[in-house]
């Protein structure tokens, strides 16, 4: 077990397809089997598929306890407000490091440990644990592929079922929790699928925080996409308009903008 005990992985989920269910099981298993850490999963949906479909499988396949804090919010809304859900988990976490973690992402163990140490001991505020550019393995998973991977965590299994693609700013970020909060957390004015990944990186760099990056690959387990995870999101135009507006701000205007966001009052 790798010691990441002063970190909390925050994972927002809505299990809207069988491949997303498989990904949640795969990534949760990977984290629990390899790291001594803390995990919060917040699920927003009509019913909890994590409890009914994922948890029984995890209990069956894991050699360790399912040490996950699962929070379920019942909702019939078609909107999965990922940004709000993340903020609620940032607020819930009580460790010095918070990891915004996409349920479809797998990172090499060495990258996870290095990102953690860069914040804990290296003076970084934010770390992107993968490179910029062609550092993404887009994995086309099947039940057999992920089962083989979970047997011994051999990344070659994922590589052999993938294509290399662009990586920039999404999936996983390690944050000093105090900095995440000080810098405005997730922008809840973005709704569902949005340029929030670009904005987050842009913002924390513009505000002068020490943002680091690790030149290694990330594995993204592909999945079906609905309106909450693709450009068909009905809020896409307003999301893009907000992103354009933020890019026109000076550092001082950006600080002023985030100091006046009403959603932040919930977390004080």
Q: Language-model segments: what does each one mean?
A:
Residues 108-188:
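Conserved catalytic core of nucleotide-sugar-dependent glycosyltransferases
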Residues 1-30:
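N-proximal low-complexity "stem/linker" segments adjacent to membrane-targeting elements
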Residues 36-49, 71-75:
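Short beta-strand/loop segment that forms part of the nucleotide-sugar
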Residues 6-10, 38, 199:
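Cell-envelope/extracellular polymer assembly enzymes that use nucleotide-activated donors
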């Amino acid at each position: 077990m790798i010691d990441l005990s002063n970190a909390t992985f925050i994972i927002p989920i809505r299990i809207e397809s069988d491949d997303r269910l498989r990904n949640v099981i795969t990534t949760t298993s990977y984290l629990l089997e390899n790291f001594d850490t803390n995990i919060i999963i917040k699920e927003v949906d009509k019913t909890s598929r994590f409890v009914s479909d994922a948890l029984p499988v995890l209990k069956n396949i894991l050699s360790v306890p399912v040490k996950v804090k699962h929070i379920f919010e019942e909702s019939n809304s078609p909107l999965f407000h990922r940004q709000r859900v993340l903020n609620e988990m940032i607020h819930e976490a009580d460790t010095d490091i918070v990891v915004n973690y996409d349920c479809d992402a797998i990172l090499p163990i060495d990258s996870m440990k290095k990102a953690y140490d860069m914040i804990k001991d290296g003076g970084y505020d934010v770390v992107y644990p993968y490179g910029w550019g062609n550092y993404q393995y887009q994995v086309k998973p099947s039940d057999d592929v992920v089962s083989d991977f979970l047997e011994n965590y051999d990344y070659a299994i994922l590589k052999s079922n993938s294509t290399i693609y662009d990586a920039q700013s999404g999936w996983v970020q390690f944050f000093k929790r105090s900095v995440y909060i000080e810098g405005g957390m997730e922008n809840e004015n973005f709704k569902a699928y949005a340029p929030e990944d670009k904005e987050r990186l842009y913002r924390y760099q513009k505000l002068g925080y020490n943002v680091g990056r690790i030149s290694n690959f990330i594995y993204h387990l592909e999945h079906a996409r609905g309106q909450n995870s693709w450009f068909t999101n009905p809020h896409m135009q307003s999301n893009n308009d907000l992103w354009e507006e933020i890019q026109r701000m000076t550092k001082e205007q950006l600080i002023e903008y985030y100091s006046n966001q009403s959603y932040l009052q919930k977390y004080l």
